[in-house]
Regions:
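C-terminal outer-membrane/trafficking sorting elements
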Residues: 299-310, 314-384
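Beta-propeller domain segments
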Residues: 6-8, 16-18, 84-246, 254, ...
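Core-facing hydrophobic residues within beta-strands of well-ordered domains
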Residues: 8, 66, 128, 197, ...
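Short glycine-/Asp-/Thr-/Trp-enriched loop segments that recur within the blades
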Residues: 1-7, 59-67, 121-124, 251-256
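Asp-box/WD-like beta-propeller blade repeats and closely related beta-sheet repeat scaffolds
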Residues: 35-71
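Short coil turn/linker residues within repeat-based beta-strand modules
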Residues: 46-49, 107, 237-239, 292-294, ...
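Short, acidic, Ser/Thr-enriched surface-loop or helix-capping motifs
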Residues: 72, 104, 263, 335, ...
Length: 384
């Protein structure tokens, strides 16, 4: 690994983990100003990442390498790539820097990408370090501004986000002319001075109802460190605008690097990254959860039974078979982004459950069945 900004930047597990335990990783090699950024996929053998396959290699820089990864329901992969400190690259369609890239999971170029034969999905990005999939298929990103205008954006195929000609909203004469000529997409929110926005996740779990339909955003706090926090960005019902912001954990005096959500319990995991740039420690992850909601899982034990899904992927209907009679209980089905899709009762001595999936979006789903004998979980796919 190189010194300075280049490092291991992002990783993402494949949604169908139980059947295909693979991990995508973005990392840099070489020196700080003469290196490469690699997108690789590894197999997980239960103890280590093995069998690396490099899917994509692009030029890296001493700063602004990105990167975040997001697997979409159509089994494509988004990867953010920073401008590596050369802002002019962001508007060049032939460059992969200063972009959001989209790949098939095997590393090939999707046929429906905006530019034929190119990984480029969006242009005009400075350094996006957050990606999240929300309701209705909306993709959100967070992006570092230079000296002003950190951004929360909606990612749109073929979109131009303005950098370096536009920072934040189109609110100067020069920016307005460029925006009109290039159909620049303005952010949902922008922050001046910079607060150093970082990892984001969509939250819609019933464990914390007050946070449902919101973006959880990690905030490093800028070079001065006075703005560090976890921001809860409440969204309008359609997800296309922000209705308010709540701020948490500022009193910890810790830079908030990233955030993740447990799709089963609704727990929120927050990565703290020390008190100052570039990270003085302690570097820790803390779990925050509603213990009243999660208490049904505290003493649960995994059954010896396995839960099989057929057909997988499903179209209009899927049958879940755990092969042994269960006591009465309840089940919950979650989309990969944590949204509760369906819940219901399990009947005494039941061995199968049929779900009607015709109206569900294509993508990955989790099911958990909770009963007096314990908890059974599984993942499955829906494809139309």
């Amino acid at each position: 690994m190189a010194a300075a900004s280049p490092a291991c930047w992002a990783w993402r597990c494949i949604p169908d983990w139980e059947n295909t335990p693979k991990v995508f990783v973005v990392y840099c090699t070489g020196s700080a100003w003469n290196g490469d950024e690699h997108l690789s996929v590894f197999d997980w053998d239960g103890t280590a990442l093995v069998n690396e396959e490099i899917l994509l290699t692009i030029q890296a820089g001493g700063i602004h390498n990105g990167s975040r990864l997001l697997v979409l329901p159509d089994n494509t992969l988004l990867m953010t790539a920073g401008d590596i400190g050369s802002s002019s690259l962001a508007q060049l369609e032939g460059s992969l820097q200063g972009k959001t890239l989209r790949l098939n999971l095997d590393g090939s170029v999707p046929e429906d990408n905006p530019i034929d034969g190119s990984y480029v999905y969006t242009i005009g990005n400075r350094n996006s370090q957050g990606l999240a999939l929300g309701a209705n298929g909306i993709i959100y990103s967070s992006e570092h501004g230079q000296n002003s205008n950190d951004e929360l954006n909606i990612v749109t195929a073929g979109g131009n986000y303005g950098w370096p000609e536009v920072e934040g909203f189109c609110n100067t004469i020069g920016e307005q002319a460029f925006c009109a000529e290039n159909d620049v997409i303005e952010p949902l929110e922008a922050w001046t001075p910079c607060i150093a926005v970082n990892g984001i996740e969509y939250y819609n779990h019933e464990a914390i109802p007050e946070w449902q339909n919101s973006i959880l955003m990690a905030v490093l706090g800028g070079l001065g460190g006075q703005y560090e926090r976890l921001s809860v960005m409440h969204l309008a019902e359609d997800g296309l605008s922000v209705t308010g912001e709540e701020q948490f954990f500022s009193s910890f005096n810790q830079r908030v690097r990233d955030v993740a959500v447990n799709p089963y319990t609704g727990s929120v995991y927050v990565a703290f990254n020390g008190t100052s740039y570039p990270g003085s420690g302690p570097n820790i992850i803390k779990e925050f959860r509603n213990e009243a909601f999660a208490s049904s899982l505290d003493d649960a034990m995994q059954l010896g039974a396995t839960l099989n899904a057929f057909p997988n992927p499903a179209n209009d209907e899927i049958q879940l078979d755990w092969g042994m009679p269960l006591s009465a209980g309840a089940y919950e089905v979650y989309a990969y982004n944590g949204q509760l899709i369906e819940s219901g009762q399990l009947f005494e001595s039941s061995t199968i459950l049929k779900l009607q999936t015709a109206s569900w979006n294509a993508g990955s789903y989790f099911i958990r069945a909770i009963h007096s004998q314990g908890t059974v979980t599984a993942t499955f796919q829906v494809a139309h």
